[in-house]
Amino acid sequence: STKMVLANCFDDKGTPSVLPNDYQGQLNLVKSLIAKGHQRIAYLSLSTHLPATTRRIDGYKYALAEAALDFDPSLLVPAEVDVGDGDAGVQLLWDAIDRVMSLPQPPTVICFGNDRMAMRAYGILRSRGIALPDDLSVAGYDGHRMITDTLYPTLASAELPYAAIGIRATELLLGMINGTA
């Protein structure tokens, strides 16, 4: 039979998989932002139907609670931009940014569900006259070096451990093939 291990995804058939710790990644990111003095931290998340989103939101909320910061539901907005969404997806991101930035107490930093969203946000925020990082800080998720290192200012991002996930998936697959897993 065909042996298979999924990396950074899973199915409902119980196929062996290796997943990142999305909870811990978001927790660590938010804790680092709090350590830099941020207290109003918005989170513009990926689609709420994704299990990773639930875990990341839990990490976000726990980091706030651990720092004795109140969770403000108005700072948590789903805003995923799917590649296939076209203009509708871009509009969703614009609307989410406008929503949190027009609050009576706007955030000092916005965390985005992934680095692509954060990259798009740089342009949106600048078009609104918001200076980065003087007026607002931005953080992403994934640690895509092509994005994080290219943007100015550089993007803070929780890094998905792609290499470690690949190595672990390979080890599991080899174990299945050799009958040791």
Which residue ranges define each predicted feature?
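Bacterial carbohydrate/catabolite-sensing allosteric modules
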Residues: 2-181
